[in-house]
């Protein structure tokens, strides 16, 4: 009887090990390799230019406000300048009631901290401004929340862009995961943008912005291809 139990126990352990191995393989298997080449772009660092076009992001009483504004910049062969601003939040959490919001707190942003495992620490978003060769803004791109439901587990991202945007670039924070909604300039009257700081290579690595190989639980963070090589 003892031998049968022992064999049964070994089979159970072996079965569990195989299942865990398959799950691990599925989770960690490579999805895609990241191409770190940035053909046609020359990285730049210009704090004054970055400050000139820095967006103003208004905080939310429940969702908080960015504490830093990081940036990377590049020029293409046409002379256009691309500025990727990264509003930086120390953390993100859905404070609302509801089963989905609760599960998010114990699985994604807290508890198991899947967000940190998948992407990296803190919450780093993206607002892009493109200038023509004469320094005039021709495009602004960002992500808003689509059909926002604060009680849901997740927030759907909706990419938006504005041609020939006019300053000041004023945004509100409509969702707990720090998406952006373009607001009337009057909302930002008297407000000053955060100091634009160059996104240094040590911090770029620290916050795991780009992964060499993406997997189910290892994903690149929001960025543009031209940011993958920093300015010296």
Regions found by a protein language model. Name each.
Residues 19-27:
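Hydrophobic alpha-helical membrane-insertion segments, chiefly the h-region
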Residues 2-19:
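N-terminal Sec-pathway targeting helices
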Residues 27-125, 131-132, 136-232:
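A domain-level signal for the mature, folded cores of soluble proteins
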């Amino acid at each position: 009887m003892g031998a049968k139990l022992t064999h049964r126990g070994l089979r159970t352990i072996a079965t569990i090990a195989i299942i865990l191995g398959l799950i691990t393989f599925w989770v960690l298997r490579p999805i895609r390799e990241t191409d770190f080449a940035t053909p046609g772009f020359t990285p730049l660092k210009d704090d004054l230019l970055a400050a000139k076009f820095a967006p103003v992001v208004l905080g939310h009483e429940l969702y908080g406000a960015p504490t830093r504004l990081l940036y990377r910049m590049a020029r293409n062969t046409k002379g256009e300048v691309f500025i990727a601003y990264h509003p930086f939040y120390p953390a993100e959490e859905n404070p609302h009631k509801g089963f989905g919001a609760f599960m998010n707190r114990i699985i994604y942003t807290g508890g198991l901290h899947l967000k940190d495992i998948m992407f990296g620490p803190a919450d780093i978003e993206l607002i892009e401004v493109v200038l023509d060769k004469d320094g005039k803004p021709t495009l602004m791109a960002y992500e808003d929340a689509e059909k926002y439901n604060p009680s849901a587990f997740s927030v759907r991202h909706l990419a938006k862009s504005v041609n020939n945007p006019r300053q000041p670039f004023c945004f509100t924070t409509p969702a707990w995961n720090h998406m952006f909604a373009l607001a009337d300039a009057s909302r930002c009257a008297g407000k000053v943008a955060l100091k634009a700081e160059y996104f240094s290579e040590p911090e770029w690595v620290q916050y795991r912005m780009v992964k060499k190989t993406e997997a189910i639980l290892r994903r690149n963070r929001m960025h543009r291809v031209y940011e993958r090589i920093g300015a010296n």
